[in-house]
């Protein structure tokens, strides 16, 4: 049997999270996610309500805990993150308030590890601050998230790449300042080596 008990200091953080989410975050769902109102991460009224909550989370040392300390997080392990996400999953706005909203969380890690200095300055820094949102574009209609049947291709044309294909279920695409898109660049390579990730500005035609 799995043992999900944790050290007293971290349990105190979990207890604080439960109370904070119940008292401060869950009410946002009643205001901004009521029937007939779509979840909109660019809603100015919602953002005005979220900002002070995010600042309190930062003061508690619980902002973006999946990230390493160099990126402003705590570098927590999977069990600790699972216990936190169990609490945050009770509300739509919880992950946004705590800086761990997908796909921003994963995109931040990709940029931190593989991004250029220019990309980090333009996209990673504001993403970590919660000033912009991003999109991860992988799923295709003919195969879902099974990369073995992906058809979207990227072909180099001089100094540029031409991407041709169709994606759907690209979370946050309508609001994203940038997308990270998965495309085939070497169709003859083994499945795990035939793809590349492309960072695409959100205003690209």
What are these regions (language model features)?
Residues 85, 108-111, 124, 180, ...:
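Conserved protein kinase catalytic domain
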Residues 130-138, 182:
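A short, Trp-centered hydrophobic/proline-enriched beta-strand micro-motif
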Residues 1-102, 118-129:
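Amphipathic, small/basic residue-rich leader segments at the start of a protein or domain
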Residues 70, 139-143, 168-169:
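Short, solvent-exposed loop/turn elements at beta->coil junctions and helix N-caps
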Residues 160, 164-205:
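A short core secondary-structure module
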Residues 154-155:
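A structural signal for short hydrophobic beta-strand segments in well-ordered beta-sheet cores
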Residues 98-118, 144:
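N-terminal glycine-rich flavin-associated loop
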Residues 141-151:
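Active-site-adjacent elements of ketosynthase-type condensing enzymes
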